[in-house]
Swiss-Prot record:
Keyword entries, A-Z: Biological rhythms, Chromophore, Cytoplasm, DNA-binding, FAD, Flavoprotein, Nucleotide-binding, Nucleus, Photoreceptor protein, Receptor, Repressor, Sensory transduction, Transcription, Transcription regulation
GO molecular function: DNA binding; FAD binding; photoreceptor activity
Chain location of the short sequence motif LIR 12 per the record: 486-491
Taxonomic lineage: Eukaryota, Metazoa, Chordata, Craniata, Vertebrata
Organism of this sequence: Erithacus rubecula (European robin)
Name of the protein in question: Cryptochrome-1
Gene: CRY1
A GO cellular component annotation in the UniProt record: photoreceptor outer segment membrane
Extent of motif LIR 2: 82-87
Residue interval(s) of motif LIR 3: 151-156
Motif segment (LIR 10): 411-416
Region feature Disordered, mapped onto this chain: 593-620
Motif (LIR 4): 255-260
Subcellular location: Cytoplasm; Nucleus
């Protein structure tokens, strides 16, 4: 009797660098590649149509590539725990292969399937290929705790064994002794469904800006490397107006779905760098996107509450406001700030926005203007963002909301000045907010300041055709910086650790921060004026922080100050220690250090609260 094998695709939707699939094929007489799709999940999950379309395109491309190997993809409807016992019997399966899933939900799911496989006498093959490293080994090297500073993470991986090279692509030669039983009704039973079959209305759906699949991913990788080689520049690209638009060399969604191997990307970058730089050793910063992704995966792998504030041992318990109306305006691009609204419109239409655009809208929602929980923003990104990844998405939102990892709350992105400096002419605004197309560049970022004659000439009256600003940014940012200052002063006293950020060495604050882990967080100055705040650090010193607060919006009387009526609820924390447990749960790990309460961090970790200073290589 022959050996029948199944490879279960989840992420890792590719044939190149797929060690689990190669191992599955070795010694097998038949192999079936399956993807399990829950139709109920499609209709009830918080995943938008662009992400579903990208996934289905990935599956279609995978099926097309398998056809070239005289094989097919089997898309099976149902739940894994229900599907596999049936498949094990029906197909007489001897071995099952999977790519290791490091996320808590995935580990729990896979443990259940391994148990079912064991009961059925099925061998389970697991290989790591969605991350560069074995995350458990990083944690073991750190004494059993995940590193919570990027510098500590870099130190640990520098002690790891060199990375293994990507395995060879699955070819007809690899498959020659292995067949796939395919019958005439395959498409009917196991074909990739359409969006319509999953219950989506596709009327008026524009064509995909980011086509899914391994074929597209590898084409983009070559373009990406060709561009780098042509300019011989491995530094972080400067942001400009063109950076805001989707790039044909962008890679982040393909890494997210595993259409592109992170190891292949890593070694291709290494080879190109050595070729251009004449064999000099590449700096860690060359791999910035990949290493930040790895950092967040490591932080999340043993923390099932990583995407929650409550019960999350590394998250500061900040008393955010609940304001559904304000949240909806932000999510739907109706804040009255063209820069914010254009970004959210692009996100909803295309499924992608530039990493610094992510910084801007995340800051606006949380600590900058609306004081709404990062959890709410994370859910919107999970729905709309093609490259939204459970670990990276949650970690990045905690980061930029100053809930974990770094605490530079005195930096505030101005919803007017940031965009104006990036795209002075306002072409990005006109592209995504055509209602403002008629405004001259002088007023396109703050159209409420335009004289009535300008608004009439633009055929757009603010408050009628386009909303007035929902908050006064100058007042909101001042209040929220004060709120954060009080929280961290109290937390610092409670833990006895120096948790407050120190003054950046660069007076503009550039070089620290980051959202989505894909690029250095150029901390952008605000709208113009700057104020100072004296912040007490955990060691008893007082430093003057440069707080970029922005211009007040003249001519905007009557703007609702939504989400700020509870300011006093946080200010009282500075006056007594009986409220401290609200900030960081007692008995948990100290924020940003991985050190238990009462112990002093080592000097390396103690200095990391200012956030990592590392040049990050963007792939977007």
């Amino acid at each position: 009797m022959g050996v029948n094998a199944v490879h279960w695709f989840r992420k890792g939707l590719r044939l190149h660098d797929n060690p689990a699939l190669r191992e599955c094929i070795r010694g097998a007489d038949t192999v079936r590649c399956v993807y399990i799709l829950d139709p109920w999940f499609a209709g009830s999950s918080n995943v938008g149509i662009n992400r579903w379309r990208f996934l289905l395109q990935c599956l279609e491309d995978l099926d097309a590539n398998l056809r070239k190997l005289n094989s097919r993809l089997f898309v099976i409807r149902g739940q894994p725990a229900d599907v596999f016992p049936r498949l094990f019997k029906e197909w007489n399966i001897a071995k099952l292969s999977i790519e290791y899933d490091s996320e808590p939900f995935g580990k729990e799911r896979d443990a259940a399937i391994k148990k079912l496989a064991s009961e059925a006498g099925v061998e389970v093959i697991v290989r790591i290929s969605h991350t560069l490293y074995d995350l458990d080994k990083i944690i073991e090297l750190n004494g059993g705790q995940p590193p919570l500073t990027y510098k500590r993470f870099q130190t640990l991986i520098s002690r790891m064994e060199p990375l293994e090279m990507p395995v060879e692509t699955i070819t007809p030669e690899v498959m020659k002794k292995c067949t796939t039983p395919v019958f005439d009704d395959h498409d009917e039973k196991y074909g990739v469904p359409s969006l319509e079959e999953l219950g989506f209305d596709t009327d008026g759906l524009p064509s995909a800006v980011w086509p899914g699949g391994e074929t597209e991913a590898l084409t983009r990788l070559e373009r990406h490397l060709e561009r780098k080689a042509s300019v011989a520049n491995f530094e972080r690209p400067r942001m400009n107006a063109n950076s805001l638009l989707a790039s044909p060399t962008g890679l982040s969604p393909y890494l997210r779905f595993g259409c592109l191997s992170c190891r292949l990307f890593y070694f291709k970058l290494t080879d190109l760098y050595k070729k251009v730089k004449k064999n000099s050793s590449p700096p860690l910063s060359l791999y910035g996107q990949l290493l930040w992704r790895e950092f967040f995966y490591t932080a999340a792998t043993n923390n099932p509450r990583f995407d929650k504030m409550e019960g999350n041992p590394i998250c500061v318990q900040i008393p955010w406001d609940k304001n559904p109306e304000a949240l909806a305006k932000w999510a739907e691009g109706r804040t009255g700030f063209p820069w914010i609204d254009a970004i959210m419109t692009q996100l909803r239409q295309e499924g992608w926005i530039h990493h610094l655009a992510r910084h801007a809208v995340a800051c606006f929602l949380t600590r900058g203007d609306l004081w709404i929980s990062w959890e709410e923003g994370m859910k919107v990104f999970e729905e709309l963002l093609l490259d939204a990844d459970w670990s990276v998405n949650a970690g990045s939102w905690m980061w930029l909301s100053c809930s974990s990892f770094f605490q530079q709350f005195f930096h505030c992105y101005c919803p007017v000045g940031f965009g104006r400096r990036t795209d002075p002419n306002g072409d990005y605004i006109r592209r995504y907010l055509p209602v403002l197309r008629g405004f001259p560049a002088k007023y396109i970022y703050d159209p409420w300041n335009a004289p009535e004659s300008i608004q009439k000439a633009a055929k757009c009256i603010i408050g009628v055709n386009y909303p007035k600003p929902m908050v006064n940014h100058a007042e909101a940012s001042r209040l929220n910086i004060e709120r954060m200052k009080q929280i961290y002063q109290q937390l610092s006293r409670y833990r006895g650790l120096g948790l407050l950020a120190t003054v950046p060495s660069n007076p503009n604050g550039n070089g620290n921060g980051g959202l989505m882990g894909y690029s250095p967080g150029e901390s952008i100055s605000g709208c113009g004026s700057t104020g100072g705040a004296q912040l007490g650090t955990g060691d008893g010193h007082t430093v003057v922080q440069s707080c970029t607060l922005g211009d007040s919006h003249s001519g905007t009387s009557g703007i609702q100050q939504q989400g700020y009526c509870q300011a006093s609820s946080i200010l009282h924390y500075a006056h007594g220690d009986n409220q401290q447990s609200h900030l960081l749960q007692a008995g948990r790990t100290a924020l940003g250090t991985g050190i238990s309460a009462g112990k002093r961090p080592n000097p390396e970790e103690e200095t990391q609260s200012v956030g990592p200073k590392v040049q990050r290589q963007s792939t977007n």
